[in-house]
Amino acid sequence: MPVVTMRQLLDSGVHFGHQTRRWNPKMKRFIFTERNGIYIIDLQQSLSYIDRAYEFVKETVAHGGTILFVGTKKQAQEAIAEQAGRVGMPYVNHRWLGGMLTNFSTVSKRVQRMKELEEIDFEDVAGSQFTKKELLLLNRELEKLQANLGGIRNMAKTPSAVWVVDTKKEHLAVDEAQKLGIPVVAILDTNCDPDEVAYPIPGNDDAIRSVNLLTRVVADAVAEGLIARQGGKSGQAAAEPMAEWERELLEQHNAQQAEQAEAPAAEAPAEPAEAPAAEAAPQGE
């Protein structure tokens, strides 16, 4: 079964690039044609690049890696949080703070500060050691930290790879990943630079449906990698207990496997025994 179909790509508008006056000549090889002043992306290439990126993400996660999901533009914020959350991966969907990767130790301290503030009961003024004004200021600090760092609260170290929606907007994230040698997997619209991305997916990085589809595909690859990782652990007596979301993924996978196994058995009796003879008849004419 393919990771994604041509019909899904078309329905989601993955093939629509930018206006012809807004393009990067390095993207020429990914462009199929031009229509009404808009570049049309070659979806046959997109399909093969999706397969390549999917395999990389799956294998990276299967071997214990982490994928950081990054997309701070409005069209990407919801999909990034939802899909990363679905598979228990870290994400940044509000604002990229300089040094999130290259100065990770300092960022980790800010995450720790956020966790400390979360321990405060802001409703209990009398029981706290702070004044009303101090609590108000601390609450504002917490809200800001949660918006910027909430998605990476459980990221203990720099990620193994980064999934990026819109490499031009997220150029800081891409630059930091490149400095550290962290592979970037990203949607490449017709105005992007393919040299910045190790695993490109030529496609529309502006349409919500396109961003949703491709981010879900990457999350599916993560899910498959987690299942493979857990399968490898199952033979170890000292394996760590699964997180709730990991257990849900494994249960979904097992249910799908069971359905697929039942389907052929249910269909088998419906096949007519005379089918080969019926097929042979036209050849005798």
From Swiss-Prot:
Annotated protein name in UniProt: Small ribosomal subunit protein uS2
One GO cellular component term: cytosolic small ribosomal subunit
One GO MF term attached to the UniProt entry: structural constituent of ribosome
Biased composition (Low complexity): 255-285
CDD domains: RPS2
InterPro entries attached to this UniProt entry: Ribosomal_uS2, Ribosomal_uS2_bac/mit/plastid, Ribosomal_uS2_CS, Ribosomal_uS2_flav_dom_sf
Tagged with keyword Magnesium: no
Family: Belongs to the universal ribosomal protein uS2 family.
An individual GO BP term: translation
Keywords for the protein's UniProt record, in alphabetical order: Ribonucleoprotein, Ribosomal protein
